[in-house]
A protein has these predicted regions:
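An N-terminal assembly and electron-transfer interface module characteristic of large anaerobic redox
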Residues: 1-166
Length: 166
């Protein structure tokens, strides 16, 4: 399952997601595409026309350019995500986003999407084990749900729980 991690540039969360058999949906992959894009003059500082068009699906044209640029870059992550983990109150070492308005809007868009989401508060110190345990439990539940859905599909059982005609 594709799991969006927030902050989307958190290597620590991305590693946890990968260790539990899911695909992390992270900002680094999106930036990598831009760095290799011939359309961009000074990667990764510039954004493309497509980024701006994509951002207009989520924000008004009157919003500041910085917000549109950030949301345009983050939008593909949101569109790919099948589940998400939001780490709140994390220190900048977990992945600084740089713009509070873009942060809040992006978290709102994740919640609005209606995908399975775990919101866990960063507390540090000895509470880290609890945080990692919550993330582990969430990822294991996702794996189990994914396997059950796969088995049901294999047996020809639809989402309603009834056997479908094959």
């Amino acid at each position: 399952m594709k799991v969006l991690v927030y902050p989307p540039n958190s290597l620590i969360l991305a590693d946890l997601v990968e260790r539990f058999g899911h695909e992390p949906v992270v900002l680094m992959k999106e930036v990598a595409k831009h760095v290799r894009d011939a359309e961009i003059d000074a990667p990764p500082l510039n954004i493309t026309e497509e980024d701006i068009k994509r951002s207009l699906k989520y924000v008004s044209v009157e919003e500041p350019a910085g917000l549109k640029g950030r949301i345009g870059l983050l939008a593909p992550l949101l569109e790919k995500a099948e589940a998400s983990i939001i780490l709140t109150d994390a220190p900048p070492t977990y992945g600084c986003m740089g713009c509070a308005v873009a942060n809040e809007l992006f978290k709102f868009l994740i919640r609005k999407k209606g995908i399975p989401t775990l919101e866990v508060r960063y507390e540090g110190g000895e509470k880290m084990e609890e945080m990692v345990a919550k993330i582990k439990d969430f990822l294991e539940r996702l794996r189990k749900q994914e396997q059950e859905a796969h088995e049901a599909k294999k047996e020809g059982i639809g989402e309603s729980g009834e056997r479908e005609a094959v």
